[in-house]
Amino acid sequence: MTLFSLLQSSPALLLSVCFVLGLFVGSFLNVVVYRLPLMMQTTWRRECKEFLQQDSQETTQETATESAGENSGTDQTPQPFNLMVPRSACPSCNSMITAWQNIPVISWLILRGKCGNCKHPISIEYPLVELLTAILSLAVAYKFGASIQLIFALLFTWSLVSLALIDFHTTLLPDSITLPLLWLGLLISLVPVFVSAPDAIVGAAAGYMILWIVFQTFKLITGKEGMGFGDFKLLAALGAWLGWAKLPLVILLSSLTGAIIGIMMMVLFKHQRSQAIPFGPYLAIAGWIALMWGDQIVAMYTGQMGL
């Protein structure tokens, strides 16, 4: 019996595997959310300095210092800094995190939310992201079962989690995630996995154009930029995965969610109206809901409208 057959015959095992897998993926996503924006900023600074032809020694020193943020030595040689190296360390005492301390959720509970060396508090966001990713992975496994759809739905879910968190913290939606997500959505439509190729192509084009038109209209009226180009690309990616027919649902859900949370932030946290609120997290939430229950929501709405 193959592993796939075993998972098909045992739903409980499938759910357990996906939950545990989600915990470890969530742990990796914490690294992505923290490091990817730093990697992007380092690249931008290096490219700008090269363009301006600044002194190469100054460029090397500043890039190494600003990118890693963890190295306090005087060596001017830039140290490797990516999603794999250097090893994760405490931002307070710079002590390396051991293997067992990387165990999702459990290690945070054992350490009582503090560094094992200096006792500096560890943000509760880390275990919450791990739990969120695990719960979403569990829901996806319950929805799709042991199928090809499950594999791609998990990739879709994990990508949206990382994009939502990065945009929430930095107001950035990295092309290194959104563009592969877009192309993968178009590629799997050839099978098709979720929607047909024509639906995916039209969905991607329409997703980009809808927000581009909104952006240009808002800018024409107010003279300000209401959103970033990353939002266009993310909605295009959602259109490629979900098809053009679910775009109205995604836009409606994301707008409602954004409006409700925005009002709550202004009332409860005195959030200034002029202060930018990232739209990516709401698109990600709406896109995931549309993947999971979009057909049922649309059917319920059209049924109530008598269509």
Model segments located where?
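Membrane-proximal soluble regions of multi-pass membrane proteins
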Residues: R35-E125
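Interhelical loop and helix-boundary elements at the membrane-water interface
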Residues: L36, P80, I103, N117-Y126, ...
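Multi-pass membrane catalytic core of lipid/isoprenoid biosynthesis enzymes
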Residues: R87, N94-A153, G230-F232, A236-A237, ...
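Functional transmembrane core segments of multi-pass inner-membrane proteins
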Residues: S5, C18, Q149-T257, M300-L307
